[in-house]
Structure formats: C-alpha cells, structure tokens
Design a protein with these regions (language model features):
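Residue(s) in the substrate-gating loop at a strand-loop-helix junction
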Residues: 142
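The beta1-alpha1 cofactor-binding region of Rossmann-like NAD(H)/NADP(H)-dependent oxidoreductases
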Residues: 40-41, 60-71, 104
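Canonical Rossmann dinucleotide-binding motif of NAD(H)/NADP(H)-dependent dehydrogenases/reductases
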Residues: 2-34
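Substrate-binding pocket helix/loop in short-chain dehydrogenase/reductase
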Residues: 97-99, 103-109
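Conserved glycine-rich Rossmann-like NAD(P)H-binding loop of the short-chain dehydrogenase/reductase
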Residues: 30-45
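Active-site helix of classical SDR
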Residues: 122, 158
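C-terminal helical subdomain
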Residues: 184, 200-236
C-alpha cells in the first residue's frame, strides 16, 4: 500500500511511535495525517511539530467507545476524505501487578483499549474500504500477545485477543478476494515511556524510530504479519516443539524475559488514568 496521496489515520497518534509513523507517512507524500488521541495538548503539539511536513488533523477520540468512534469517523471523512490507511496504535498497560492484585476496572480498561478499540475503529471503516475495494488496516499488537509473561497477564491477554482477531479478519478478506489488506505487527518492548523500568538483559529494548520504520515498510509491502525483531516470528514454533519446562527455562532464565516486568514503573499518565478508573 502506497502512502503517497493517502489519508492516514493513526490512533494514539499524538505521541510515541504513532506520531513518528505519522511523520513518516507525510514524508512519503501522504495527503493528510489524521490523529485520534485522548490527549488534546498532545494533539495540538503534534500538529505544530508535524505541520511543516504536510496536512495534519487532530481529534479527541475515546477509541474504546464505539459510538464516539463512529461519529469521529464521519467527521474525519467530511474533513479529509475517505480513509486509505488506518493504524491502530493506541494502547495501555496499567501496572506490573500479579493477577491476584488486579482490579476489575484495570482488567476492563486494558481489554477495552487494547482489544476492543481496534475492533471498533476497524468496524467503523472497513465497510467503506470493502465497498471501494481499497484500503489497509495495520494493528499494532505486541510480542506479549505470543509469549506469556508474568506481571502482565491481562496485557498479554489483551494482545493475544488482538492478534487472533486481526489475523482472522485478514483471512476473511483473503477469502473474499478483497484488495483491502491487514497487517498485524507484534513488537517487543519499545522505549517510548510506556514500558519505563522494563529490564531486558539479552534482547535490547527497541528504539521507536526503528519500530516505526519497520511498520511503515510492512504496510508498503502488504505484509500479513511482522514480528519485531524478526526472531519473534518463531516463538510459536518453539512453543510447539519444546517441552514447557525447557521453553520456560530458556525464555525465563536465559533470556530474562519472565523477569522483565519486575521493576516496571510505566508512564505516569497511564497510572493516573488507571487510578481514576479504579
């Protein structure tokens, strides 16, 4: 899918890799970068920062609210025209609590934003894409959606759900012989602030620019799935062939992944939102 002359909508686009991908899309000739975010100040700052690259429109949208999403979609189309590329990038992790300490509100908020929100956004736009037989949906999930990890059980569940949904819709479109494409992206921890305090002794925490560049390239090439780094493509293979105790020993003790969240602090804004929801 080409970015040139495309209207590109990115949820969570006011910061992190969402904002970086928006800039990259404009650099590649996108007609308009449409930001959906809940942070008005962040939206305005991103518009000022990226305005020199091209047209940027921003809307305050709670993507976990289906009615709000539908109204915001209608407004975006009125202002910018049909959406060609949507990147579901909004996400949250509330804490590093073990599951027995997680509140029902934390569970609900995590599942709503990480799993249901990309479904809501895509459901609003997909019928029009199918009618035009044109468009691309990219869902940013997580390597945590393929690899179980202590102290992030609900986050992992939300991303497992997102991966299963995203890839299932991809196959539905394939069976329809549609030209609308789906890309599922599963990156490792990214150094954007969302995973402050994470420790990863073997696999380095990923740089946002690197991840954004890989995602943009995956969309351009209509890739079905992209693990970042590439080695994460093989996680499921090793899970199937290795005994569980060997798999746990390697990823938990050798790679240190099962202890990555032990000192997690996260982004203060996410913690505040979680406490307000509790």
């Amino acid at each position: 899918m080409k970015f040139e002359n495309a209207n590109v909508l990115i949820t969570g686009g006011a910061s992190g890799i969402g904002k970086i991908m928006g800039r990259m899309a404009l650099e590649k000739g996108a007609k308009c970068f449409i930001i959906w975010d809940i942070n008005l100040a962040g939206i305005e700052a991103a518009r000022k920062e990226l305005g020199r690259f091209g047209k940027v429109k921003g809307y305050v949208v709670d993507v976990s609210n289906y009615e709000v999403v539908n109204l915001a979609y209608i407004k975006a189309v009125e202002d910018c025209g049909e959406i060609d590329i949507v990147i579901n990038c909004a996400g949250i992790i509330t804490s590093n609590k073990t599951f027995d300490l997680m509140s029902a509100d934390e569970m609900t908020r995590t599942m709503n934003i990480n799993t249901l929100a990309p479904m809501f956004v895509t459901r609003a736009m997909l019928p029009d894409m199918l009618q035009r037989d044109h468009g691309h949906v990219c869902n940013i999930t997580s390597a945590g959606g393929m690899l179980s990890n202590p102290r992030m059980s609900v986050y992992a569940a939300s991303k497992w759900g997102a991966i299963g949904w995203s890839d299932s819709v991809r196959i539905e479109l394939q069976n329809m012989k549609s030209r609308v494409h789906f890309t599922t992206v599963a990156p490792y921890f990214i150094n954007t602030g969302m995973f402050n305090g994470v420790k990863s002794p073997i696999i380095p925490v990923l740089k946002p620019e690197y991840v954004a560049k890989r995602i943009i390239k995956a969309i351009e090439r209509n890739k079905s799935f992209r693990g970042i780094p590439f080695g994460f493509h093989f996680i499921r293979f090793w899970q199937f062939i290795l005994p569980t105790r060997i798999f746990d020993w390697f990823f938990g003790e050798v790679m240190g992944i099962y202890h990555a969240m032990d000192e997690f602090t996260g982004r203060k804004s996410d913690a505040i939102k979680a406490s307000k929801a509790s």
